């Protein structure tokens, strides 16, 4: 896969950043926000966009709490009628969230000025409605999670391990809900329950308990008699003997001290 990076000395917004690469787009193209986890079928999304003869298409996902999302109103034909930004549920015009996944024709870039901060939701989409452009919403059953909070990040990890997301989990599947990476070492006395991923070259010591949904990244070292519940260890993290972790995220190469008890939050570095 070839990847082209576009560095912005000054941020240009969701639309301004795409406009900066306008000379790269000579056909239908897809924009996907990078802070979400999804298994949306891009092929089907683009086919829908073309069948509708649209200039722009937004992938929509129904949500329960609209106060966290921009919502989109559509008619029976899928045509977008209006937008509302993070309304209270009782005031929402719709429960269909803008996922930040878009399909455009190159002509849509004409609505974006060059070199200035410009946003799709706030600036471009209202113009498309005002001009009466063919602008539609795609509604299908796909997984989507806006990973904008620690709680959402943890939940997305759990959803992957429980099979709710159509993604490939690295490692060898051993029994129901357990994936083990290459050269990982797991002591025979370790207790593992729920959905657990143990990464490449990780070490799980004697008497360790991994309970609930737990992700152990590559090169992690969990020393004896540690208990970890519903937590994520990023690559290179280590946990001292007898420690207890629950509902937390342990950062890259972070060392949890022996006998330490931690509940909730994210551990990045010590003060």
Residue positions per predicted region:
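Structural signal for interior beta-strand "rungs" in well-ordered beta-sheet cores
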Residues: 173-271
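Conserved beta-loop-beta/alpha segment of the NTase-like Rossmann-fold superfamily
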Residues: 1-76
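Nucleotide phosphate-binding site architecture
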Residues: 19, 38, 109-110, 211, ...
């Amino acid at each position: 896969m070839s990847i082209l990076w576009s560095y912005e000395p000054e941020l240009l917004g969701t639309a301004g950043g795409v406009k900066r690469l306008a000379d790269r787009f000579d056909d239908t193209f897809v924009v996907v926000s990078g802070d979400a986890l999804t298994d949306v079928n891009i092929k089907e999304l683009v086919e829908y966009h073309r069948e509708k003869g649209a200039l722009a298409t937004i992938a929509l996902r129904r949500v329960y709490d609209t106060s966290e999302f921009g919502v989109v109103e559509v008619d029976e034909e899928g045509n977008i009628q209006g937008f509302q930004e993070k309304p209270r549920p009782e005031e929402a015009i719709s429960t269909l969230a803008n996922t930040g996944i878009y399909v455009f024709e190159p002509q849509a870039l004409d609505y974006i000025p060059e070199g200035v901060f410009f946003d799709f939701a706030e600036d471009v989409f209202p113009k498309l409605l005002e001009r009466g452009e063919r602008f539609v919403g795609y509604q299908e059953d796909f997984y989507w999670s806006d990973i904008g909070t620690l709680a959402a990040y943890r939940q997305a990890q759990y959803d992957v391990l429980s099979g709710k997301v159509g993604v490939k989990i690295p490692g060898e599947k051993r029994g129901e809900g357990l994936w083990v990476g290459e050269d990982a070492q797991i002591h025979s006395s370790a207790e593992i329950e729920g959905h657990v991923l143990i990464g490449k070259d990780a070490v799980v010591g004697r008497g360790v308990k991994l309970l609930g949904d737990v992700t152990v990244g590559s090169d992690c070292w969990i020393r004896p008699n540690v208990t970890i519940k519903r937590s994520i260890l990023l690559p290179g993290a280590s946990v001292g003997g007898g420690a207890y972790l629950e509902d937390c995220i342990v950062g890259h190469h972070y060392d949890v001290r022996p006998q330490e008890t931690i509940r909730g939050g994210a551990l990045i570095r010590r003060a």
